[in-house]
Amino acid sequence: MSTYRKTYKNQSKRFNNGNNSNSTSTELTNLVEMFPDWEADELQGLLSENDNSLEIVIDLIVNNKVSKWEPIKKEKHKKKEHKDDTTDSVTGNANGASNSGSSNSTTASGDRRLNNKAKASTSSRPPKRQQHPNAAHKKNEKTERSKASTVSTTTTSATSSVTKESVPPSNSWAAALSNDKPKKQETKSEASESIPSSNDGGDAETVPEVEQAETLEESHQEPENVEEPIESVSEQSQPENTKPVLKSAAIPEPKQGSWASAIAPKTKPKPKTVSKPVPQPEESKPEEHIPVQEEAQPVESVLEDKPAVEAVQPVQPPVEDEPVEAPAASSVAAVADASFSEPTASSIIDQQPQVVLPTTQQQVDSVGISFGSLSVDAGEPKEAAEVIQDETISEQVQPEQQQQSQQQPLQEQQRYGLYNQQPTQQRYQQNNYQQQGQYSKQQQQQLQQQNTSQPTQQQTTIRLLWSISTTTISSTNSSTRCSIWWLSWILL
Protein backbone atom coordinates (compact mmCIF):
# COMPACT_ATOMS: atom_id res chain seq x y z
CA MET A 1 0.00 0.00 0.00
CA SER A 2 2.78 2.40 0.86
CA THR A 3 4.55 1.86 -2.47
CA TYR A 4 1.31 2.45 -4.35
CA ARG A 5 0.68 5.67 -2.46
CA LYS A 6 4.20 6.91 -3.05
CA THR A 7 3.91 6.34 -6.77
CA TYR A 8 0.51 7.95 -6.85
CA LYS A 9 1.86 10.92 -4.96
CA ASN A 10 4.71 11.26 -7.43
CA GLN A 11 2.24 11.10 -10.29
CA SER A 12 0.11 13.79 -8.70
CA LYS A 13 3.14 16.00 -8.28
CA ARG A 14 3.86 15.74 -11.98
CA PHE A 15 0.49 17.26 -12.78
CA ASN A 16 1.17 20.27 -10.52
CA ASN A 17 2.64 23.40 -11.96
CA GLY A 18 6.33 24.11 -11.70
CA ASN A 19 5.74 27.24 -9.56
CA ASN A 20 3.67 25.34 -7.03
CA SER A 21 6.33 22.63 -6.69
CA ASN A 22 9.07 25.15 -6.14
CA SER A 23 7.07 27.10 -3.55
CA THR A 24 6.08 23.98 -1.61
CA SER A 25 9.64 22.69 -1.61
CA THR A 26 11.04 25.92 -0.14
CA GLU A 27 8.27 26.13 2.46
CA LEU A 28 8.75 22.50 3.42
CA THR A 29 12.48 22.95 3.88
CA ASN A 30 11.89 25.98 6.07
CA LEU A 31 9.33 24.15 8.19
CA VAL A 32 11.52 21.05 8.53
CA GLU A 33 14.38 23.25 9.72
CA MET A 34 12.16 25.09 12.18
CA PHE A 35 10.36 21.98 13.48
CA PRO A 36 12.66 18.97 13.21
CA ASP A 37 10.27 16.88 15.35
CA TRP A 38 7.61 17.03 12.69
CA GLU A 39 7.62 14.78 9.68
CA ALA A 40 7.83 16.16 6.16
CA ASP A 41 4.55 14.50 5.15
CA GLU A 42 2.69 16.08 8.03
CA LEU A 43 4.09 19.53 7.29
CA GLN A 44 3.24 19.19 3.61
CA GLY A 45 -0.34 18.22 4.49
CA LEU A 46 -0.65 21.32 6.68
CA LEU A 47 0.70 23.52 3.89
CA SER A 48 -1.74 22.10 1.38
CA GLU A 49 -4.68 22.63 3.75
CA ASN A 50 -3.68 26.25 4.48
CA ASP A 51 -2.88 27.32 0.85
CA ASN A 52 0.91 26.99 1.32
CA SER A 53 1.14 29.83 3.85
CA LEU A 54 4.06 29.56 6.25
CA GLU A 55 2.69 32.04 8.77
CA ILE A 56 -0.57 30.18 9.32
CA VAL A 57 1.19 26.81 9.72
CA ILE A 58 3.74 28.27 12.15
CA ASP A 59 0.94 29.84 14.26
CA LEU A 60 -0.94 26.56 14.37
CA ILE A 61 2.13 24.61 15.48
CA VAL A 62 3.36 27.20 18.01
CA ASN A 63 -0.08 27.69 19.63
CA ASN A 64 -0.60 23.91 19.81
CA LYS A 65 -3.67 24.11 17.62
CA VAL A 66 -2.25 21.25 15.56
CA SER A 67 -0.54 18.25 17.10
CA LYS A 68 1.39 15.28 15.84
CA TRP A 69 0.33 11.69 16.04
CA GLU A 70 1.13 10.77 19.63
CA PRO A 71 0.44 7.67 21.74
CA ILE A 72 -1.24 9.76 24.46
CA LYS A 73 -4.30 10.53 22.33
CA LYS A 74 -5.07 7.02 21.20
CA GLU A 75 -8.84 6.74 21.03
CA LYS A 76 -9.50 10.21 19.68
CA HIS A 77 -7.03 9.84 16.82
CA LYS A 78 -8.38 6.43 15.93
CA LYS A 79 -11.87 7.82 15.59
CA LYS A 80 -10.59 10.70 13.50
CA GLU A 81 -8.67 8.34 11.23
CA HIS A 82 -11.76 6.25 10.57
CA LYS A 83 -13.70 9.39 9.71
CA ASP A 84 -10.94 10.58 7.39
CA ASP A 85 -10.91 7.20 5.64
CA THR A 86 -14.64 7.32 5.04
CA THR A 87 -14.51 10.90 3.78
CA ASP A 88 -11.58 10.10 1.50
CA SER A 89 -13.39 7.11 0.02
CA VAL A 90 -16.53 9.18 -0.58
CA THR A 91 -14.58 12.02 -2.18
CA GLY A 92 -12.62 9.53 -4.33
CA ASN A 93 -15.81 7.94 -5.64
CA ALA A 94 -17.32 11.32 -6.32
CA ASN A 95 -14.20 12.46 -8.14
CA GLY A 96 -14.12 9.24 -10.19
CA ALA A 97 -17.73 9.71 -11.24
CA SER A 98 -17.09 13.31 -12.16
CA ASN A 99 -14.01 12.31 -14.14
CA SER A 100 -15.97 9.67 -16.09
CA GLY A 101 -18.83 12.08 -16.73
CA SER A 102 -16.61 14.94 -17.86
CA SER A 103 -14.31 13.00 -20.23
CA ASN A 104 -15.71 14.91 -23.23
CA SER A 105 -14.83 18.31 -21.74
CA THR A 106 -11.94 20.48 -22.88
CA THR A 107 -8.30 19.85 -21.96
CA ALA A 108 -8.17 22.97 -19.82
CA SER A 109 -11.00 21.72 -17.68
CA GLY A 110 -9.30 18.29 -17.48
CA ASP A 111 -6.07 19.90 -16.31
CA ARG A 112 -7.95 21.83 -13.64
CA ARG A 113 -9.68 18.68 -12.41
CA LEU A 114 -6.38 16.82 -12.25
CA ASN A 115 -4.90 19.66 -10.21
CA ASN A 116 -7.90 19.55 -7.84
CA LYS A 117 -7.50 15.79 -7.51
CA ALA A 118 -3.82 16.19 -6.74
CA LYS A 119 -4.59 18.77 -4.08
CA ALA A 120 -7.29 16.56 -2.53
CA SER A 121 -4.97 13.57 -2.56
CA THR A 122 -2.15 15.54 -0.94
CA SER A 123 -4.50 16.90 1.70
CA SER A 124 -6.16 13.58 2.50
CA ARG A 125 -3.52 10.90 1.94
CA PRO A 126 -0.62 12.04 4.12
CA PRO A 127 -2.54 11.11 7.27
CA LYS A 128 -3.10 7.65 5.74
CA ARG A 129 0.65 7.20 5.56
CA GLN A 130 0.88 8.23 9.17
CA GLN A 131 -1.55 5.53 10.20
CA HIS A 132 0.70 2.55 9.62
CA PRO A 133 3.87 3.63 11.49
CA ASN A 134 1.76 5.11 14.27
CA ALA A 135 -0.32 1.93 14.48
CA ALA A 136 2.88 -0.09 14.72
CA HIS A 137 4.08 2.16 17.51
CA LYS A 138 0.77 1.78 19.30
CA LYS A 139 0.88 -2.00 19.05
CA ASN A 140 4.43 -2.04 20.37
CA GLU A 141 3.47 0.22 23.24
CA LYS A 142 0.50 -1.99 24.12
CA THR A 143 2.70 -5.07 24.18
CA GLU A 144 5.30 -3.25 26.28
CA ARG A 145 2.75 -2.09 28.80
CA SER A 146 1.11 -5.49 28.98
CA LYS A 147 4.51 -7.10 29.59
CA ALA A 148 5.40 -4.52 32.22
CA SER A 149 2.05 -4.99 33.94
CA THR A 150 2.47 -8.78 33.96
CA VAL A 151 6.00 -8.43 35.33
CA SER A 152 4.84 -6.00 38.00
CA THR A 153 1.94 -8.27 38.97
CA THR A 154 4.25 -11.27 39.20
CA THR A 155 6.71 -9.33 41.32
CA THR A 156 3.99 -8.01 43.60
CA SER A 157 2.44 -11.48 43.92
CA ALA A 158 5.85 -12.96 44.67
CA THR A 159 6.56 -10.33 47.31
CA SER A 160 3.12 -10.81 48.85
CA SER A 161 3.64 -14.59 48.98
CA VAL A 162 7.05 -14.09 50.57
CA THR A 163 5.61 -11.76 53.20
CA LYS A 164 2.76 -14.17 53.87
CA GLU A 165 5.23 -16.99 54.34
CA SER A 166 7.28 -14.86 56.71
CA VAL A 167 4.32 -13.62 58.80
CA PRO A 168 3.19 -16.93 60.44
CA PRO A 169 5.42 -17.41 63.51
CA SER A 170 7.23 -20.66 64.09
CA ASN A 171 6.63 -22.87 67.11
CA SER A 172 10.35 -23.24 67.93
CA TRP A 173 13.57 -21.28 67.64
CA ALA A 174 15.08 -23.95 65.33
CA ALA A 175 12.25 -23.47 62.81
CA ALA A 176 12.77 -19.70 62.91
CA LEU A 177 16.47 -20.11 62.08
CA SER A 178 15.73 -22.58 59.29
CA ASN A 179 13.19 -20.25 57.67
CA ASP A 180 15.72 -17.42 57.34
CA LYS A 181 17.85 -19.10 54.66
CA PRO A 182 15.13 -19.72 52.03
CA LYS A 183 14.00 -16.12 52.44
CA LYS A 184 17.38 -14.84 51.33
CA GLN A 185 17.33 -17.15 48.33
CA GLU A 186 13.87 -15.96 47.36
CA THR A 187 14.92 -12.31 47.47
CA LYS A 188 17.88 -13.07 45.20
CA SER A 189 15.67 -14.89 42.72
CA GLU A 190 13.16 -12.02 42.75
CA ALA A 191 15.88 -9.48 42.08
CA SER A 192 17.17 -11.60 39.19
CA GLU A 193 13.65 -11.82 37.76
CA SER A 194 13.07 -8.08 37.98
CA ILE A 195 16.31 -7.28 36.13
CA PRO A 196 15.54 -9.33 32.99
CA SER A 197 11.98 -8.05 33.07
CA SER A 198 13.30 -4.51 32.85
CA ASN A 199 15.66 -5.58 30.09
CA ASP A 200 12.77 -7.13 28.20
CA GLY A 201 10.88 -3.88 28.46
CA GLY A 202 13.89 -2.05 27.02
CA ASP A 203 14.22 -4.52 24.14
CA ALA A 204 10.56 -4.22 23.32
CA GLU A 205 10.95 -0.49 23.03
CA THR A 206 13.77 -0.77 20.46
CA VAL A 207 11.69 -0.97 17.32
CA PRO A 208 13.23 -0.52 13.86
CA GLU A 209 12.92 3.16 13.09
CA VAL A 210 12.45 4.45 9.57
CA GLU A 211 12.54 8.20 10.11
CA GLN A 212 14.27 10.61 12.46
CA ALA A 213 11.03 11.95 13.98
CA GLU A 214 10.02 8.46 15.16
CA THR A 215 13.22 8.13 17.19
CA LEU A 216 12.44 11.36 19.01
CA GLU A 217 8.89 10.23 19.77
CA GLU A 218 10.13 6.96 21.22
CA SER A 219 12.73 8.79 23.30
CA HIS A 220 9.86 10.67 24.96
CA GLN A 221 7.97 7.44 25.56
CA GLU A 222 10.87 5.49 27.07
CA PRO A 223 11.03 7.25 30.47
CA GLU A 224 7.38 6.43 31.06
CA ASN A 225 8.05 2.73 30.62
CA VAL A 226 11.27 2.87 32.63
CA GLU A 227 9.35 4.09 35.67
CA GLU A 228 7.50 0.78 35.97
CA PRO A 229 10.59 -1.44 36.54
CA ILE A 230 11.83 1.18 38.99
CA GLU A 231 8.63 0.76 40.96
CA SER A 232 9.02 -3.02 40.89
CA VAL A 233 12.58 -2.70 42.21
CA SER A 234 11.35 -0.42 45.00
CA GLU A 235 8.67 -2.96 45.88
CA GLN A 236 11.35 -5.65 46.09
CA SER A 237 13.49 -3.47 48.37
CA GLN A 238 10.65 -3.12 50.87
CA PRO A 239 10.45 -6.83 51.85
CA GLU A 240 14.24 -6.95 52.05
CA ASN A 241 14.18 -4.12 54.58
CA THR A 242 11.40 -5.73 56.57
CA LYS A 243 13.00 -9.18 56.82
CA PRO A 244 15.59 -8.30 59.51
CA VAL A 245 12.71 -6.97 61.63
CA LEU A 246 10.97 -10.33 61.34
CA LYS A 247 14.15 -12.10 62.42
CA SER A 248 14.51 -10.04 65.58
CA ALA A 249 10.82 -10.59 66.43
CA ALA A 250 10.82 -14.36 65.86
CA ILE A 251 13.92 -15.40 67.85
CA PRO A 252 13.44 -13.76 71.31
CA GLU A 253 9.69 -14.52 71.53
CA PRO A 254 9.13 -18.31 71.64
CA LYS A 255 5.48 -19.30 71.78
CA GLN A 256 3.77 -21.65 74.19
CA GLY A 257 4.26 -24.73 72.02
CA SER A 258 8.10 -24.72 72.34
CA TRP A 259 10.22 -26.11 75.16
CA ALA A 260 12.13 -22.81 75.35
CA SER A 261 8.96 -20.97 76.43
CA ALA A 262 8.54 -23.35 79.39
CA ILE A 263 12.12 -22.69 80.60
CA ALA A 264 12.00 -18.92 80.08
CA PRO A 265 12.11 -17.12 83.50
CA LYS A 266 10.71 -13.83 82.17
CA THR A 267 7.13 -14.66 83.16
CA LYS A 268 7.83 -14.51 86.93
CA PRO A 269 8.32 -10.73 87.49
CA LYS A 270 5.13 -9.84 85.55
CA PRO A 271 2.58 -10.87 88.24
CA LYS A 272 4.61 -9.01 90.90
CA THR A 273 4.18 -5.70 89.13
CA VAL A 274 0.46 -6.33 88.78
CA SER A 275 -0.02 -7.33 92.44
CA LYS A 276 1.80 -4.32 93.96
CA PRO A 277 -0.82 -1.61 93.38
CA VAL A 278 -3.65 -3.89 94.62
CA PRO A 279 -2.80 -3.96 98.40
CA GLN A 280 -2.27 -0.19 98.61
CA PRO A 281 -5.97 0.73 98.87
CA GLU A 282 -6.44 -2.13 101.36
CA GLU A 283 -3.70 -0.72 103.62
CA SER A 284 -5.18 2.76 103.43
CA LYS A 285 -8.61 1.54 104.56
CA PRO A 286 -7.56 0.32 108.08
CA GLU A 287 -5.62 3.54 108.59
CA GLU A 288 -8.79 5.49 107.98
CA HIS A 289 -10.81 3.31 110.38
CA ILE A 290 -8.26 3.42 113.24
CA PRO A 291 -9.06 7.00 114.39
CA VAL A 292 -12.75 6.14 114.33
CA GLN A 293 -12.12 3.31 116.74
CA GLU A 294 -10.00 5.55 118.95
CA GLU A 295 -12.73 8.15 119.00
CA ALA A 296 -15.27 5.49 119.89
CA GLN A 297 -13.24 4.35 122.91
CA PRO A 298 -13.77 7.48 125.08
CA VAL A 299 -17.48 7.31 124.33
CA GLU A 300 -17.57 3.72 125.52
CA SER A 301 -15.58 4.67 128.64
CA VAL A 302 -18.10 7.38 129.47
CA LEU A 303 -20.93 4.89 129.00
CA GLU A 304 -19.16 2.44 131.27
CA ASP A 305 -18.64 5.14 133.90
CA LYS A 306 -22.34 5.98 134.09
CA PRO A 307 -23.49 2.49 135.13
CA ALA A 308 -20.69 2.46 137.69
CA VAL A 309 -22.19 5.58 139.26
CA GLU A 310 -25.61 4.02 139.14
CA ALA A 311 -24.24 0.85 140.77
CA VAL A 312 -23.12 2.88 143.80
CA GLN A 313 -26.65 4.07 144.48
CA PRO A 314 -28.22 0.66 145.37
CA VAL A 315 -25.72 0.37 148.26
CA GLN A 316 -27.72 3.04 150.06
CA PRO A 317 -30.53 1.76 152.31
CA PRO A 318 -34.03 2.02 150.83
CA VAL A 319 -35.34 3.92 153.85
CA GLU A 320 -33.08 6.92 153.26
CA ASP A 321 -33.98 7.30 149.53
CA GLU A 322 -37.50 8.55 150.27
CA PRO A 323 -36.60 12.10 151.40
CA VAL A 324 -34.54 12.49 148.23
CA GLU A 325 -37.52 11.78 145.97
CA ALA A 326 -39.93 13.99 147.91
CA PRO A 327 -38.23 17.35 147.18
CA ALA A 328 -37.86 16.35 143.53
CA ALA A 329 -41.61 15.82 143.25
CA SER A 330 -42.32 19.09 145.03
CA SER A 331 -39.92 20.95 142.74
CA VAL A 332 -41.63 19.53 139.65
CA ALA A 333 -45.03 20.67 140.97
CA ALA A 334 -43.71 24.16 141.69
CA VAL A 335 -42.23 24.46 138.21
CA ALA A 336 -45.53 23.33 136.63
CA ASP A 337 -47.44 26.01 138.57
CA ALA A 338 -44.93 28.74 137.76
CA SER A 339 -45.19 28.66 133.94
CA PHE A 340 -47.27 26.89 131.29
CA SER A 341 -44.45 26.33 128.82
CA GLU A 342 -42.15 24.26 131.07
CA PRO A 343 -43.85 20.84 131.58
CA THR A 344 -41.91 19.28 128.71
CA ALA A 345 -38.61 20.56 130.13
CA SER A 346 -39.45 19.11 133.56
CA SER A 347 -40.23 15.74 132.00
CA ILE A 348 -36.81 15.80 130.33
CA ILE A 349 -35.22 16.49 133.73
CA ASP A 350 -37.07 13.54 135.29
CA GLN A 351 -35.89 11.21 132.54
CA GLN A 352 -32.22 12.13 133.02
CA PRO A 353 -30.20 10.24 135.69
CA GLN A 354 -29.50 11.97 138.99
CA VAL A 355 -26.16 13.78 139.22
CA VAL A 356 -24.06 13.04 142.32
CA LEU A 357 -21.80 15.97 143.17
CA PRO A 358 -18.53 15.42 145.10
CA THR A 359 -18.31 16.43 148.79
CA THR A 360 -15.41 18.82 148.29
CA GLN A 361 -17.20 20.95 145.66
CA GLN A 362 -18.80 24.14 146.96
CA GLN A 363 -22.47 24.76 146.37
CA VAL A 364 -23.25 27.60 144.01
CA ASP A 365 -26.80 28.97 144.23
CA SER A 366 -26.47 31.92 141.90
CA VAL A 367 -23.58 33.62 140.13
CA GLY A 368 -25.41 36.72 138.96
CA ILE A 369 -26.64 35.12 135.71
CA SER A 370 -30.24 35.74 134.66
CA PHE A 371 -32.15 33.98 131.88
CA GLY A 372 -34.38 35.69 129.38
CA SER A 373 -38.14 35.21 129.37
CA LEU A 374 -40.47 33.99 126.64
CA SER A 375 -42.48 37.17 126.92
CA VAL A 376 -41.78 40.62 128.29
CA ASP A 377 -44.15 40.30 131.29
CA ALA A 378 -43.25 36.73 132.32
CA GLY A 379 -39.77 37.45 133.67
CA GLU A 380 -40.41 37.04 137.44
CA PRO A 381 -41.96 33.53 137.46
CA LYS A 382 -39.06 32.17 135.39
CA GLU A 383 -36.52 33.50 137.83
CA ALA A 384 -38.47 31.88 140.67
CA ALA A 385 -38.48 28.56 138.80
CA GLU A 386 -34.70 28.73 138.31
CA VAL A 387 -34.16 29.37 142.04
CA ILE A 388 -36.35 26.36 142.85
CA GLN A 389 -34.29 24.15 140.52
CA ASP A 390 -31.06 25.22 142.23
CA GLU A 391 -32.58 24.45 145.64
CA THR A 392 -33.64 20.97 144.52
CA ILE A 393 -30.10 20.20 143.35
CA SER A 394 -28.68 21.35 146.71
CA GLU A 395 -31.26 19.30 148.64
CA GLN A 396 -30.36 16.19 146.66
CA VAL A 397 -26.66 16.61 147.44
CA GLN A 398 -27.12 17.05 151.24
CA PRO A 399 -28.87 13.71 152.06
CA GLU A 400 -26.34 11.83 149.94
CA GLN A 401 -23.49 13.33 151.98
CA GLN A 402 -25.25 12.38 155.20
CA GLN A 403 -25.70 8.80 154.01
CA GLN A 404 -22.01 8.43 153.19
CA SER A 405 -20.96 9.89 156.60
CA GLN A 406 -23.26 7.46 158.46
CA GLN A 407 -22.07 4.40 156.54
CA GLN A 408 -18.38 4.94 157.27
CA PRO A 409 -18.51 4.68 161.16
CA LEU A 410 -20.83 1.65 161.01
CA GLN A 411 -18.45 -0.22 158.75
CA GLU A 412 -15.45 0.65 160.96
CA GLN A 413 -17.19 -0.59 164.10
CA GLN A 414 -18.07 -3.88 162.48
CA ARG A 415 -14.48 -4.38 161.30
CA TYR A 416 -12.92 -3.65 164.70
CA GLY A 417 -15.44 -5.91 166.54
CA LEU A 418 -14.81 -8.86 164.27
CA TYR A 419 -11.04 -8.32 164.33
CA ASN A 420 -10.63 -9.66 167.87
CA GLN A 421 -12.97 -12.66 167.44
CA GLN A 422 -11.57 -14.17 164.20
CA PRO A 423 -8.38 -16.29 164.05
CA THR A 424 -5.18 -15.18 162.43
CA GLN A 425 -5.94 -16.70 159.02
CA GLN A 426 -9.23 -14.88 158.74
CA ARG A 427 -7.56 -11.65 159.83
CA TYR A 428 -5.10 -11.92 156.95
CA GLN A 429 -7.95 -12.44 154.47
CA GLN A 430 -9.91 -9.52 155.91
CA ASN A 431 -6.94 -7.21 155.62
CA ASN A 432 -6.62 -8.06 151.93
CA TYR A 433 -10.34 -7.62 151.43
CA GLN A 434 -10.30 -4.25 153.20
CA GLN A 435 -7.42 -3.04 151.06
CA GLN A 436 -9.25 -4.10 147.92
CA GLY A 437 -12.45 -2.42 149.10
CA GLN A 438 -10.63 0.82 149.87
CA TYR A 439 -8.95 0.76 146.48
CA SER A 440 -12.28 0.19 144.74
CA LYS A 441 -13.89 3.02 146.72
CA GLN A 442 -11.13 5.39 145.75
CA GLN A 443 -11.62 4.51 142.09
CA GLN A 444 -15.37 5.01 142.37
CA GLN A 445 -14.92 8.39 144.00
CA GLN A 446 -12.54 9.49 141.24
CA LEU A 447 -15.03 8.41 138.58
CA GLN A 448 -17.82 10.25 140.37
CA GLN A 449 -15.76 13.41 140.50
CA GLN A 450 -15.03 13.19 136.78
CA ASN A 451 -18.67 12.57 135.90
CA THR A 452 -19.97 15.36 138.09
CA SER A 453 -17.42 17.87 136.83
CA GLN A 454 -18.56 17.38 133.24
CA PRO A 455 -22.27 18.27 133.70
CA THR A 456 -21.42 21.25 135.89
CA GLN A 457 -19.16 22.60 133.17
CA GLN A 458 -21.92 22.05 130.63
CA GLN A 459 -24.41 23.90 132.79
CA THR A 460 -22.15 26.90 133.22
CA THR A 461 -21.41 27.09 129.49
CA ILE A 462 -25.11 26.80 128.61
CA ARG A 463 -26.01 29.56 131.06
CA LEU A 464 -23.38 31.82 129.59
CA LEU A 465 -24.66 31.13 126.07
CA TRP A 466 -28.20 31.77 127.22
CA SER A 467 -27.32 35.15 128.75
CA ILE A 468 -25.46 36.17 125.58
CA SER A 469 -28.39 35.13 123.40
CA THR A 470 -30.86 37.11 125.51
CA THR A 471 -28.77 40.25 125.34
CA THR A 472 -28.24 40.01 121.56
CA ILE A 473 -31.80 38.99 120.73
CA SER A 474 -33.67 41.37 123.04
CA SER A 475 -35.78 42.82 120.23
CA THR A 476 -36.48 39.58 118.34
CA ASN A 477 -39.65 37.48 118.36
CA SER A 478 -40.60 35.04 121.07
CA SER A 479 -40.28 32.07 118.68
CA THR A 480 -36.51 32.51 118.33
CA ARG A 481 -36.15 32.70 122.12
CA CYS A 482 -38.16 29.53 122.54
CA SER A 483 -35.96 27.67 120.08
CA ILE A 484 -32.79 28.78 121.88
CA TRP A 485 -34.29 27.82 125.25
CA TRP A 486 -35.21 24.34 124.00
CA LEU A 487 -31.71 23.77 122.62
CA SER A 488 -30.11 24.75 125.92
CA TRP A 489 -32.25 22.30 127.92
CA ILE A 490 -31.63 19.48 125.42
CA LEU A 491 -27.89 19.99 125.79
CA LEU A 492 -28.27 19.69 129.56
Swiss-Prot record:
The keyword Heme does not apply. It is found in: Cytoplasm; Nucleus; Chromosome, Telomere. Residues 180-191, 282-292 have a biased composition (Basic and acidic residues). Residues 1-25, 73-309 are annotated as: Disordered. Residues 1-12, 126-140 have a biased composition (Basic residues). Residues 23-66 form the CUE domain. Signal peptide: none annotated. One of its GO terms (biological process) is DNA repair. Residues 16-25, 91-109, 148-164 have a biased composition (Low complexity). Ubiquitinated. GO terms for cellular component: chromosome, telomeric region; cytoplasm; nucleus. Residues 202-216 have a biased composition (Acidic residues). It comes from the Eukaryota. Keywords: Chromosome, Cytoplasm, DNA damage, DNA repair, DNA-binding, Nucleus, Telomere, Ubl conjugation, Ubl conjugation pathway. GO terms for molecular function: DNA binding; ubiquitin binding. Recruits the ubiquitination machinery to RNA polymerase II for polyubiquitination, removal and degradation, when the transcription-coupled repair (TCR) factor RAD26 fails to efficiently displace stalled RNA polymerase II. Also involved in telomere length regulation. Binds DNA. Belongs to the DEF1 family. Homodimer; may form higher order oligomers. Interacts with the large RNA polymerase II subunit RPO21; the interaction is direct and serves to bridge RPO21 to the Elongin complex in a manner dependent on transcription stress. Interacts with RAD26. This is RNA polymerase II degradation factor 1.
